């Protein structure tokens, strides 16, 4: 189909009268429709012109030059016959309006505080301050009246000697450096001394199984805070960490009491609730108690399964009715004693591995322990459990092996205490003047003056440190947080118990 090329619609209207007539008729019909549909008699803003489409159409036989028409290869669509939409009143068309807008000034973006995070390992961003670095840079020692008076007298001597005066901040820095170096070096010496006194002691035994032997994969591990010794398997240590190791109670900073015996300290693990603690040895030797995960040796479970008769037993060694006691394994012998009391007195406590890989625990009272040891020494084998007579709970230990062991343990403890006291009395030997002077870039004479004053002040204060160590402050803060969490846990536990009680009462009604 050919389409004619027309310069403009006005020329078509002048040259072809029929086209203008068609447009006028169409416009009148459009105006008539619009006037009928509108309540107000006004001209429409636009109409559809069909004359433009008619003027463009040419028959294929029409003779034109090739540059006067375009050939459309696309098929013709019927909706194109509706015409072209054109405006009727050009005055009603909105005129474009433009104006120059003033340049907006960019506002400074302020990052919300909740998105600001400071990490100790990463340097702070530009414009922000690392709180930890700022706290470490602040001097923790403050001068008191005595320090100020001594500083004034010392500065007068410095003037006479021709030395520069010493300011308060420098004095605080030097005294803080003395305290920090003394604390670090003394702790290292204490750990070394206590390590030599325990790890290389031939009498040291595991706190759980009381065995002094270790093997590959089941080494004996010492707590760096309370110095208890345990096997890896006995305490559930899957992998020995490099460096220091702390038991569960020391790691949490708590000193709980055992639920089953009156002994304080030792290798303890928590129950399922986490609020009560039990010695691992007590959990192993009391038959009703179990351990949730044998690999980790925690939590302690089934404490509620202990019968009331066992809770009512009185220990024959400490004479206390506290916790749950065990009884002698000899038939017809009912002597009761705590597990930890039996270990402290050196009673015979055996672990037997049965044929079906079942572990049996045998415990013997003081009388039967002495009989069995005497018979084993003479080569007569083990004692006959069925024929052994009943012993009284008040029978004393016949061979004083337990007392001798207690004396040796007390002697070792007293030796350690003497070493520790000697280290505390000689605290000033753990500070090197040259190292402090080089670290702070101060003259050795000034540091020596402060060193002598620091020694006198600590001796007057019974060798106590002048500032609290950072580690102790962190431990105190951690302990406070632990106490808060513990109180919350107790609150939630009581709340749950109350809800369960209400639910039970509701069900009964």
UniProtKB/Swiss-Prot annotation:
The subcellular location is:
Nucleus; Chromosome; Cytoplasm; Cytoplasm, Cytoskeleton, Cilium basal body
- Modification Phosphoserine occurs at: 89
Keyword field: Activator, Apoptosis, Cell projection, Chromosome, Cytoplasm, Cytoskeleton, Isopeptide bond, Metal-binding, Nucleus, Phosphoprotein, Repeat, Transcription, Transcription regulation, Ubl conjugation, Zinc, Zinc-finger
Instruction: Outline the segment boundaries, as ranges, of region: Disordered.
Output: 1-45, 373-399
Q: Where are the zinc fingers (PHD-type)?
A: 203-253, 313-369
Among Gene3D superfamilies, the record links this protein to: Zinc/RING finger domain, C3HC4 (zinc finger)
Q: Which GO terms describe its biological process?
A: apoptotic process; chromatin remodeling; regulation of transcription by RNA polymerase II
> Which parts of the sequence are C2HC pre-PHD-type zinc fingers?
255-289
GO CC terms in record: cell projection; cytoplasm; cytoskeleton; histone acetyltransferase complex; nucleus
Question: Where does this chain mainly localize?
Answer: nucleus
Region (Interaction with histones) residue ranges read 80-188
Briefly, what is this protein's role?
Answer: Scaffold subunit of some HBO1 complexes, which have a histone H4 acetyltransferase activity. Plays a key role in HBO1 complex by directing KAT7/HBO1 specificity towards histone H4 acetylation (H4K5ac, H4K8ac and H4K12ac), regulating DNA replication initiation, regulating DNA replication initiation. May also promote acetylation of nucleosomal histone H4 by KAT5. Promotes apoptosis. May act as a renal tumor suppressor. Negatively regulates canonical Wnt signaling; at least in part, cooperates with NPHP4 in this function.
Q: Which PANTHER family match?
A: PHD FINGER PROTEINS, PROTEIN JADE-1
Q: What is this protein called?
A: Protein Jade-1
Q: Which organism is it from?
A: Bos taurus (Bovine)
User: Gene for this protein?
Assistant: JADE1
């Amino acid at each position: 189909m050919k389409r004619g090329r027309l310069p403009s619609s006005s020329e078509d209207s002048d040259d072809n009268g029929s086209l203008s007539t068609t447009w006028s008729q169409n416009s009148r019909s459009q105006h008539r429709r619009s006037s009928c549909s509108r309540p107000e008699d006004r001209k429409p803003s636009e109409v559809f012109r069909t004359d433009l489409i008619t003027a463009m159409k040419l028959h294929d036989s029409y003779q034109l030059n090739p540059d006067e028409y375009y050939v459309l290869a696309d098929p013709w669509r019927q909706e194109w016959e509706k015409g072209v939409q054109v405006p009727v009143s050009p005055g009603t068309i909105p005129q474009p309006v433009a104006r120059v807008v003033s340049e907006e000034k960019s506002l400074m973006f302020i990052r919300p505080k909740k998105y600001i995070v400071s990490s100790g390992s990463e340097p702070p961003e530009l414009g922000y301050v690392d709180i930890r670095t700022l706290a470490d840079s602040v001097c923790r020692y403050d001068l008191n009246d005595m320090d100020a008076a001594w500083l004034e007298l010392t500065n007068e001597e410095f003037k006479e000697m021709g030395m520069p005066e010493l300011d308060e901040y420098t004095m605080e820095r030097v005294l803080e450096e003395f305290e920090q170096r003394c604390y670090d070096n003394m702790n290292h010496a204490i750990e070394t001394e206590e390590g030599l006194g325990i790890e290389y002691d031939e009498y040291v035994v595991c706190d759980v199984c009381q065995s002094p032997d270790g093997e590959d994969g089941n080494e004996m591990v010492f707590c760096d805070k309370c110095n208890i010794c345990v096997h890896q398997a006995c305490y559930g240590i899957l992998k020995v960490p490099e460096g220091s190791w702390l038991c569960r109670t020391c790691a949490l900073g708590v000193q709980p009491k055992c639920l089953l015996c009156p002994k304080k300290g030792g290798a303890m693990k928590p129950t399922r609730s986490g609020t009560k603690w039990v010695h691992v040895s007590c959990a192993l030797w009391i038959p009703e108690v179990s351990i949730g995960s044998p690999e980790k040796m925690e939590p302690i479970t089934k404490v509620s399964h202990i019968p009331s008769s066992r809770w009512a037993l009185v220990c024959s060694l400490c004479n206390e009715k506290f916790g749950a006691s065990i009884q002698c394994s000899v038939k017809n012998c009912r002597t009761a004693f705590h597990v930890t009391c039996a270990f402290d007195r050196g009673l015979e406590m055996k672990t037997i591995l049965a044929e079906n890989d079942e572990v049996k625990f045998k415990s013997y009272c003081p009388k039967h322990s002495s009989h069995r040891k005497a018979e084993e020494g003479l080569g007569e084998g083990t004692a006959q459990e069925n024929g052994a007579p009943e012993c009284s709970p008040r029978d004393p230990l016949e061979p004083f092996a337990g007392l001798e062991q207690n004396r040796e343990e007390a002697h070792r403890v007293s030796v350690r205490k003497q070493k520790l006291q000697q280290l505390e009395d000689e605290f000033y030997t753990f500070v090197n003047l040259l190292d402090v002077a080089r670290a702070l870039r101060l003259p050795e004479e000034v540091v020596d003056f402060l060193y002598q004053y620091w020694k006198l002040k600590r001796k007057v204060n019974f060798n106590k440190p002048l500032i609290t160590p950072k580690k102790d402050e962190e431990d105190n803060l951690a302990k406070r947080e632990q106490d808060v969490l513990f109180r919350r846990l107790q609150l939630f536990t009581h709340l749950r118990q109350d809800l369960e009680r209400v639910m039970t009462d509701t069900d009964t009604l």
